[in-house]
Design a protein with these regions (language model features):
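His/Glu-based metal-binding/catalytic segments typifying zinc-dependent metallopeptidases
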Residues: 1-33, 118-141, 203-300, 458, ...
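M16 family metallopeptidases and their MPP-like homologs
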Residues: 2-10, 39-152, 172-182, 188, ...
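Glycine-rich, charged/polar anion/phosphate-binding loops
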Residues: 10, 48-51, 161, 260-263, ...
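Generic solvent-exposed, charged/amphipathic alpha-helical segments
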Residues: 25, 37, 82, 157, ...
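Conserved active-site and cofactor/substrate-binding residues in soluble primary-metabolism enzymes
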Residues: 31, 76, 155, 354, ...
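Short alpha-helical segments and helix-capping/turn motifs at coil-helix boundaries
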Residues: 146-147, 157-166, 259-262, 277-281, ...
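Long, compositionally biased intrinsically disordered regions
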Residues: 149, 162-249, 390, 399, ...
Length: 570
């Protein structure tokens, strides 16, 4: 069950509100330990709480959502939100949280890193947030630096507290939305549809039935009909001459700094240093790998020796562009038949060059000073993690099915499954539902993994900056590396991943079913070439699209192939 508290906030033509409510979302809800989120969790309303500000419509909506709550908690949900906000409005919002929120969003605005999405496309989409509603104001949200400066000046003035009063507490333009599951709803709706169709069919004459059959045959013929050459010629396409044969340059320079291997990437970054500390996981036993996934989820959102987890998050975002952790896999494409790979636990951060020492200090605080024995917080994180995994399985059922199927035969996929997929979810679910019986084992394993991997001899660094940023990094590395775990290292040799072939299904509340079939074409005697990427396009947009989606009426079908021989259909 989902409980949602929503308020309309002005219009998207107000550039100050456009950013101010992003900052409020951070300070009140999104940051770990944020007061409104904490109040709802402490009240037992939902296993996870999130906020959002939909600013891409003319009347933006600020929302507070509790997941896995109960319908009976509606009044408590409303009163907890409003009582907490009244108290915050009277006593004031944590000023450091506001500064952290402003810096967080300003850093990302200046950095303009949209990952794999073209920067021009993302800027163009943002223009529509205002341009759709006033043709003379396409750029108001692109000129954000003066707005950020304005918001910084308002931190001590009560401006943000007044926004809470005006647009949330005293604003009648809002809604409470409850979404609750109904067991057997899909079966009931299918039966109702079948009954309606049966009644409809009985009311048709023989001529009307014949007309339907004829129309269906005409549709099938249309679906199978080849497009006319003159119609195909109207579609703009790239020629080979339009595609460069030159690959983008790769800047990798292997160095040593204070006895630590450093992979340096000399790229102009506008004064930002991008740091990744990689810790080898190759000697962590298979049965402990799910706990490595949990450790990755815990670090950064649990108390440390010097900070509460909310204070830690704010301290990071006041001084840096953020810190995150992940588990990564690097396959050896020269040994695909042996299926060799390297797994790492990574902590990544970015900061302006003068703040790199603070970045490393915060990374050290997370890795070495986290209170992994905090039972109450661990239980909260497990509940949140379980809920988010459930949500991700529903929203990305195709990738979930492919990963699980590949894990039957691929050690690489098996690693991913037990650290982030269904295998991982099964461990998290068991720990969360049997926490009192399992908590000592959980804490022991988290501490064991941390002690074994966060060591100088287990560390490699990757760093991206212009040349002037390299000296700053080399000055900061020794103190960080020397602060890691020392002493005799417990070793169990190279981890061996065991795969087991299965045929299994998992039931969810989604109406869409996903069926995956996977295998390894290199094991079958074939080899990887770039032609397989062309085959993927042909299959996905021609054969599979026509036969599965257009003619078959299914939701869709996808395929894929990679360098290590893994292939899938889903």
């Amino acid at each position: 069950t989902y409980l949602s508290y929503n308020k309309v906030v002005g219009t998207s033509l107000d550039e100050k509100l456009y950013l101010a409510f992003e900052i409020l979302d951070y300070a009140l809800l999104s940051a770990p330990g944020a007061p409104l989120k904490k109040a709802l969790i402490d009240a037992g309303i939902g296993k996870d709480v999130s906020g959002s500000f939909d600013s891409g419509i003319y009347q933006p909506v600020f929302s507070i959502v509790a997941k896995n709550a109960n319908v009976e908690q509606k009044e408590a949900f409303i009163s907890t939100i409003e009582d907490t906000l009244r108290k915050i409005a009277e006593e004031g919002i944590d000023k450091k949280a506001l500064r952290a929120g402003i810096n967080y969003h300003e850093f990302r605005f200046r950095e303009a890193d949209f990952g794999s999405y073209p920067r021009g496309l993302m800027y163009g989409l943002q223009l529509f947030d205002s341009w759709l509603y006033d043709e003379e104001k396409p750029f108001i949200h692109m000129k954000a630096i003066p707005t950020f400066e304005f918001l910084k000046e308002q931190i001590e003035t009560g401006y943000f507290e007044e926004l809470i009063r005006e647009y949330i507490l005293d604003n009648p333009h809002g809604s409470i939305v409850i979404i609750r599951p109904e067991q057997g709803m899909t079966a009931r709706m299918d039966k109702e549809l079948a009954d309606r169709l049966q009644v409809y069919k009985k009311g048709l004459s023989a001529e009307e039935i014949e007309a339907l059959v004829k129309a269906t045959k005409e549709l099938e013929a249309y679906q199978e009909e080849e497009s006319a050459p003159e119609d195909l010629a109207k579609i703009p396409v790239l020629g080979r001459e339009d595609i460069s044969r030159e690959i983008a340059p790769i800047y990798n320079e292997e160095r040593q700094t204070d006895g630590v291997k450093l992979l340096y990437h000399d790229v102009e970054t506008n004064g930002i240093g991008y740091v990744t500390a990689l810790f080898d996981l190759s000697e962590i036993e298979e049965e402990l790998l799910p706990y490595a996934g949990i450790l990755q989820s815990v670090l950064g959102i649990i108390d440390t020796e010097h900070y509460g987890y909310g204070e830690l998050f704010n301290e990071i975002n006041v001084h840096t562009g953020g810190i995150g952790t992940s588990l990564e896999l690097y396959t050896d494409v020269t040994k695909v038949e042996e299926k060799e790979f390297r797994a790492t636990f990574e902590i990544k951060g970015k900061a302006l060059y003068p703040k790199l020492d603070v970045l490393f200090a915060m990374m050290r605080e997370i890795l070495m000073e986290s209170k992994l024995g905090d039972e109450k917080r661990l239980k909260e994180i497990l509940s949140m993690l379980k809920t988010r995994l459930q949500t991700s399985f529903l929203s990305a059922g195709h990738t979930t099915a492919v990963l699980r199927s590949l894990s039957y035969t691929s050690p690489i996929a098996r690693f991913r499954d037990i650290t982030s997929g269904i295998g991982f979810y099964e461990v998290v679910k068991d720990l969360e539902e049997n926490f009192e019986e399992r908590k000592e084992l959980l804490i022991e394993n988290l501490k064991k993994i941390a002690g074994r991997i966060f060591r100088k001899e287990n560390l490699m660094l990757s760093y991206t900056s212009a040349q002037e940023g390299l000296a700053v990094l080399e000055k900061a590395v020794p103190q960080f590396a020397d602060s890691l775990h020392t002493g005799e290292k417990e070793s169990h040799g190279q981890c061996i991943i065991h795969c087991k072939k299965r045929n299994e299904g998992f039931r969810t509340s989604s109406k869409v079913q996903y069926v995956a079939r996977t295998g390894n074409f290199i094991d079958g005697g074939a080899e990887y070439t770039g032609a397989l990427q062309i085959l993927k396009v042909i299959l996905s947009y021609d054969y599979l699209w026509q036969n599965v989606r257009v003619k078959g009426g299914a939701y869709g079908c996808m395929s894929g192939f990679n360098r290590i021989g893994e292939g899938y259909l889903v």
